């Protein structure tokens, strides 16, 4: 059942990492025209309609009440996630400190105008965005399913070193120490 690569005998298709999802988020801090602009920008960059995020609790210092719309996000999966990362990863400088214990990582893009499809418009301004990438191995659904769920064995869990190697080889980016 196992297939071996020409360079070594340790390749196994069930151990190959893959992208489960990519979440692109813009936190504005308040609703109104700025939030509508952010939603438009997210829609143009990702090709998918964003959903509004709401405040989880009231923060008096920032004049935010629980339930107020304060941001927008888009969740990308499969080919759309791959295409977005092809565009977004060259805009960011990744470090190993951005990877968590399970191989997921996040990075920020300071200006939306860095994307090739975007140009500066003085009436809109400049917005930054956060990108979170969730990496998994085949078989992770076992831990998430409702019936007969099991924990993932330690040797099958994704670690930061495997995630860095996957990102560097797949997207031709360099992850610094």
Curated annotation (Swiss-Prot):
InterPro entries the UniProt entry points to: Ribosomal_uL5 (IPR002132), Ribosomal_uL5_arc (IPR022804), Ribosomal_uL5_C (IPR031309), Ribosomal_uL5_CS (IPR020929), Ribosomal_uL5_dom_sf (IPR022803), Ribosomal_uL5_N (IPR031310)
GO terms of biological process kind: translation
Record GO cellular component, one term: ribonucleoprotein complex
Transmembrane stretches, start-end: none
GO terms of molecular function: rRNA binding; structural constituent of ribosome; tRNA binding
Keywords, in A-Z order: Ribonucleoprotein, Ribosomal protein, RNA-binding, rRNA-binding, tRNA-binding
Protein's UniProt keywords contain tRNA-binding: yes
Ribosomal protein listed as a keyword: yes
Assembly and oligomerization: Part of the 50S ribosomal subunit. Interacts with protein L18 and the 5S rRNA, and probably with tRNAs. Forms a bridge to the 30S subunit in the 70S ribosome.
Family (UniProt): Belongs to the universal ribosomal protein uL5 family.
Purpose: This is 1 of 5 proteins that mediates the attachment of the 5S rRNA onto the large ribosomal subunit, stabilizing the orientation of adjacent RNA domains. Forms part of the central protuberance. Modeling places the A and P site tRNAs in close proximity to this protein; the 5S rRNA and some of its associated proteins might help stabilize positioning of ribosome-bound tRNAs. In the 70S ribosome it is thought to contact protein S13 of the 30S subunit (bridge B1b), connecting the 2 subunits; this bridge is implicated in subunit movement.
Protein name (Swiss-Prot/TrEMBL): Large ribosomal subunit protein uL5
Source organism phylogeny: Archaea, Methanobacteriati, Methanobacteriota, Stenosarchaea group, Halobacteria
Gene name, Swiss-Prot/TrEMBL: rpl5
